[in-house]
Structure formats: C-alpha cells, structure tokens
Design a protein with these regions (language model features):
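Beta1/beta-strand and adjacent pyrophosphate-binding region of the FAD-binding site
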Residues: 3-15
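Core beta-strand elements of the Rossmann-like FAD/NAD(P) dinucleotide-binding domain
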Residues: 3-5, 146-155
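Short hydrophobic core segments
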Residues: 10, 150-161
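Conserved N-terminal/central alpha/beta ligand/cofactor-binding core
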Residues: 21-125, 147, 159-176, 183, ...
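An anion/pyrophosphate-binding glycine-rich loop and adjacent beta-alpha core
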Residues: 36-38, 190-329, 426-509, 517-522
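Conserved beta-strand-loop-beta-strand element in the redox core of flavoprotein oxidoreductases
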Residues: 127-150
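A glycine-rich dinucleotide-binding beta-alpha-beta segment and adjacent secondary-structure elements
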Residues: 315-381, 409-422, 537-594, 599
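Extended, charge-enriched "interface" segments that sit outside catalytic cores
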Residues: 439, 456-618, 622-627
C-alpha cells in the first residue's frame, strides 16, 4: 500500500519529537514513526534536562518555538543552577525530571498537534531517486516500513538515536537491542549504506537503577535544589512551582574497596575484553574507564538521583559500567549506605551505528541526497538536549524546503545550537559530541537569559514562533529596555552613595552615581542596591535578571560584538554549492580536497575545516572576488 505525506520523521526520541513538532507547527503534513509509542521522548540514561551548556540549549530550543523546556518545567523534581561561582554567561540550569511524566506529556503534545500523525512502525528503507538538481546526486522520495508499507514524502529526517544495529553489553553477555532493552533497528543502516552514506560505530552506557528503600540515605550527603528559580519556558506559569516540593538528590563516593573490586574484575568488562569496538563518550566515561584514566584519584563522586515521584528507581550518576551483574552488585554494595542495596535494572553499555556528520550541510540536510536530514545521536552527538536542538533545526528546515523557502542556519555568534551544528558539519567528531560552554568563542553573548532576544525573531521569521510567544517576547523586551533606562538615569547623591559604600566596606564615592554604575561594580548586584532604589518597580524575575546582567557585562559584550562585526562580512559570505575547489589555482591540494569533500556553505565554515589554513582562505577570497 502506498501512502503520502510531506515530511517523514524516523524515530520519536528527543530529536524526533522536536523535528516532528516543528514541521507540523509550520503547517506541513508530517508523519512521525516510532518503534514503540510507549517509548516516546524516553530518557534511557540520566533523568535530567539541562546542565552545563545543555541548559543553554534548552532555553534556545524554547526561544525558537520548541517543546523540551515546557515539558521539563512541568515535571521538574528539583532545579539547580550550575557554575554560580563563575560569570553569568556560563550559569546553566539543570533539572531532575520525572521520566515517565515527561514521556506522557510529550506524547500528549504530539497527539494533539495539527498536521501530525504518529505511527508505530519500523522504517527499514529510505527510497531515493537520481536527480539532476546540483549539487545533489539523489533525492529522497519515500520510506518503507517493516510491515511492507511505502510512504511517499518530500523530505525525511532520520532520528535513530542508539537504535541502529544497537547491541547491549553486560560482561561477556551481548545481544541485539536498543536502549532499555527495546528492539533495535536492523534494516535502516543497510539502506543508508546502499545510498552512499558513511557510518561509524559509537558506544555509550548507563548505570544501574537501585531500589530506593534499600539505600540508607542517612549515610549520604544531601543535595537540595533551589527554592527560587526561573522556568525554562515562556509558556510556564511561575505559580506552577509555588507549592511544589523540591525532591533532594544525594552524594556518595567510591572508596578503595570499590576500586579494588573494579580493578580485580576489569578484564570482565565488555569495554576492556575487546567485545566493544565503538568509541565511547570522553566526558561521560564508565566507572572502570575512570579508574584507568584517573588512576591517582582516591575516590570518585557519585550522585543518587530520583527517576520519578511514583517509582522506587534511583539513578546512580557517574557509575555506568559494562561489568557483569555479580560485579555490579559487589561494587555497588561497597558504597557507604548501599550495603543492602538491590538493583532493579542492571547497568549496560550499548554500541550503535551513527553517521560522520561532515556529510551534512549546516541545515542538517545530507550533501548528496536532497530532502534527507539527520538529527540527534544519529549525527554523532550525546545527550537529550543536543538531540532536541538538532531535531528542531532539521524539522524547521525540512518544512521550509518542502515549501520552497530558504533554510535556517544559525551562526556561532548567535547560539550554542549554531556552534554545535557548525562543529559537527565542519570538523566532524570521532567520539560522541557533548556541548560545553568552552566550545563557544562567543559565550559572553550567549547567556541563558537572553536566548529569546537572540533567537525568537529567527523562529518567528521561519514561521514556528506563535503569536502568543512573540507578543510575550516583545512585552518582555520592552520591560527590560525600560528598566535598563531607569537604572541608568536614577542617580544617587555623593553623600548617600558614600554612606552606602562605607557601610559595605568600600571606598567613598567621588561623585554622585547612577544605580547602573553600582551594578557594574564587581561587589554589587541588583538585590544588594535595593536600599538605595526606593522607587523600584515590581517586575518579573526574568526581566530583572536580563536587565541587570546586561548592565553589569555591557563593556565585555560591547568588545565581543565589535569582534563579531569585524568577522561577520567574511564569516557569512556564501560559497556556491557547486564550486570546483580542485581547479582553483593556488589552493593547496590538501585544502582543495577537504573543501571539495565537505562543501562548506560559507567562508566561515571553510576556515574552520581541519587542514584549511588562513593562506588557503585568502586564495579562496581572491578567487571569489571578495578581496
């Protein structure tokens, strides 16, 4: 039976959900395929959303019109802001989320979205035809399911997660499976290979889930969450959090006994017995890998985190392993407070197929296959937030292409999402890629609190940001501008300022000062000058945060914006997709070959490709007549 839609999304994990919602909300007929309707937006690893740089991604997804932030807000068990000891640019929100409630909410959102159908079926084949449309050699025209259905489509987005030829490892036992023991996707990898797509093999893992009532929490350190915090999403009413109880997490440490057990049995780990060939995540190593890489450390910190309000399962962050079940019990019970612990789900490692992301444009469309997109762990990343961010962009661009409109390409200077995609498509990755604030050279500009200012207008132009969201954004923007002006123009006399400063252990004022001048001082913030601000208006917390932070870091931001402007002309200069690099005189052979293979869309992307140096860029600019 042949069926028809405009956009097909393969896989309903965090990438697939955002891709399908973006496409459908932009008015495009969309079908989302999943191997199990019960595993939509699953969190097979840590039950949390956000973290260092990841929190920034969630705010950016929300600013563009995505869904992750709102759903995370509604199921928050605990919220914390990381990196508070550092500058505001790297403050990152992280929430413990109720895993099952998150899935239920996301499934409900999908079911209620117009232009979107959900179907439980496995996609086993991508159907393509040859095309004369440069620079593509093929065009996607449909997909086939394991049930024999053919769905014709204009675009398809692959969000396969860790399901493609997935294989689980526990000690010397291994078997084909997706995460959580779900079925793996067997046929799709062969179809991708047949279409000339290069695949890689990556690995990740997850710790055991332990029964809460068998842990002696009196022996663990308690980690409380924040009582006063801002939501991820513009949609979330702050009243939702007023009567919620913060569920605590706990901290425990490995010890010498734990380490001896692991060392004595490390030969039984699938990682070290030669069974696993895939590359694992550098920034989320297994416990046995930690002992090998950090042999001098006497202990490792572990976090004991709730999986949900209505389950006994506790997640032991930092304790992932592929050791056999008997060793898992032995090392777990060596921990303080875990002497009688019972495992509900065993830890495992999982190996899976993914692509070399340099095969993609910054739109996340395959360079050789028109209308075929990739997103999420399928593109070589790790993490729910990285996946959701890519899914959103792939969904937007698939919808825009279907409607004959220009794609959305986010710059490094305007978003972490742009940085993530630029890194993947120009540099590639040889290990699961994780977003970090240090990956952005423009991080002073990319705060969590100004994500809407940076990206909501882009989402609006693309047709994803709703009227309600845009109206709320404009109102907030106006409030911020008014408050900044008020702080800049409200002056405190020299006498009052001196009295205030001396009481705070500071030198006396040399003249009258504005409230903004005081905020710019390193020792003061908005709350600390309240006694001088007698006519302070009652404003929302998010308005206060952005207004005061803008003022405090204005000097640094101005310098970084000047740097962005300096490189903007060359950075965004487009490169013809059919440019013949191999015949550009003066271009080194290595550079020409790399450029010909990766086909960058802009001069900025070309400059970041490994093997392309500044002299090569100069040759390219002269050839294009830019210099």
């Amino acid at each position: 039976m042949e069926l028809k839609t405009q956009v097909v999304v393969v896989g309903a994990g965090h990438a697939g959900v955002e891709a399908a919602l973006a496409s459908a909300r932009m008015g495009v007929d969309t079908v989302l395929f999943t191997m199990s309707l019960d595993s939509i937006a699953n969190m097979p690893c840590n039950p949390s959303i956000g973290g260092t740089a990841k929190g920034h991604l969630v705010y950016e997804i929300d600013a563009l019109g995505g869904e992750m932030g709102r759903s995370a807000d509604l199921v928050t068990l605990q919220s914390r802001t990381l990196n508070l000891g550092k500058g505001a640019a790297v403050h990152s929100k992280r929430v413990q989320a109720d895993r099952r409630k998150y899935q239920q909410i996301m499934k409900s959102v999908l079911e209620k979205t117009q232009n979107l159908r959900l179907i439980q079926a496995e996609i086993t084949e991508i159907i393509t035809v040859e095309t004369a449309e440069p620079p593509y050699s093929k065009r996607v025209v449909g997909v086939k399911t394991s049930l024999g259905e053919t769905w014709n489509c204009d675009a398809a987005i692959i969000c396969g997660g860790t399901f493609l030829n997935g294989r689980i490892f526990v000690g010397d036992v291994s078997y084909p499976a997706g995460p959580d023991g779900l079925l793996d996707a067997k046929g799709l990898s062969d179809s991708l290979l047949a279409n000339g797509i290069k695949l890689m093999r990556f690995k990740t893992g997850t710790p055991a889930r332990v029964k809460k009532s068998t842990i002696d929490f009196s022996q663990l350190e308690i980690q409380e969450g924040e009582t006063d915090f801002l939501p991820y999403s513009w949609k979330t009413d702050l009243a939702h959090f007023e009567n919620r109880t913060n569920v605590p997490c706990h901290i425990v440490y490995t010890n010498e006994k734990t380490h001896k057990i692991i060392r004595d049995n490390i030969h039984r780990s699938a990682m070290y017995s030669g069974q696993i060939h895939g590359t694992g995540p550098r920034y989320c190593p297994s416990i046995e890998d930690k002992l090998v890489r950090f042999a001098d450390k006497e202990r490792h910190q572990l976090f004991v985190e709730p999986v949900g309000e209505n389950t006994e399962e506790m997640y032991i962050q930092g304790f992932s392993t592929s050791l056999p079940t008997d060793v898992q019990y032995e090392m777990l019970r060596s921990l303080k407070g875990f002497e009688n612990a019972e495992i509900m789900r065993y830890a495992y490692a999982i190996e899976y197929d993914c692509i070399d992301p340099t095969q993609l444009y910054a739109t996340l469309e395959f360079k050789e296959i028109s209308g075929l997109y990739g997103a999420g762990q399928f593109n070589g990343t790790s993490g729910y937030e990285e996946a959701a961010a890519q899914g959103l962009i792939a969904g937007m661009n698939a919808a825009l292409k279907t409607n004959g409109k220009e794609p959305v390409i986010l710059n490094r200077s305007e978003s972490y999402i742009g940085t993530l995609i630029d890194d993947l498509t120009t540099k590639g990755t040889n290990e699961p890629y994780r977003m970090m604030t240090s990956r952005s050279e423009y991080r002073l500009l990319l705060r969590q609190d100004n994500a809407d200012e940076r990206l909501t207008p882009i989402g609006r132009r693309a047709g994803l940001v709703s009227d309600d969201q845009y109206a709320k954004f404009l109102a907030k923007k106006e409030e911020i501008a008014k408050e900044k002006e008020r702080l800049e123009t409200t002056y405190i006399s020299k006498e009052k300022a001196t009295e205030f400063l001396i009481n705070k252990g500071q030198d006396p004022a040399k003249s009258g000062v504005s409230l903004a001048d005081l905020i710019r001082r390193p020792d003061f913030d908005y709350d600390q000058i309240a006694e001088l601000d007698v006519d302070r208006p009652s404003l929302p917390k998010d308005v206060i945060l952005t207004a005061s932070t803008d003022i405090k870091y204005a000097g640094y931001v101005k310098r970084q914006l000047a740097e962005v402007k300096k490189y903007e002309k060359i950075e965004s200069k487009p490169l013809p997709r059919d440019l013949d690099y191999l015949n550009i005189k003066g271009l080194r052979i290595e550079a020409a070959q790399k450029l010909d293979k990766l086909k960058p869309l802009t001069v900025g992307q070309a400059s970041r490709i490994s093997g392309v140096n500044p002299a090569d860029i100069s040759v390219l600019l002269i050839y294009l007549g830019i210099k």
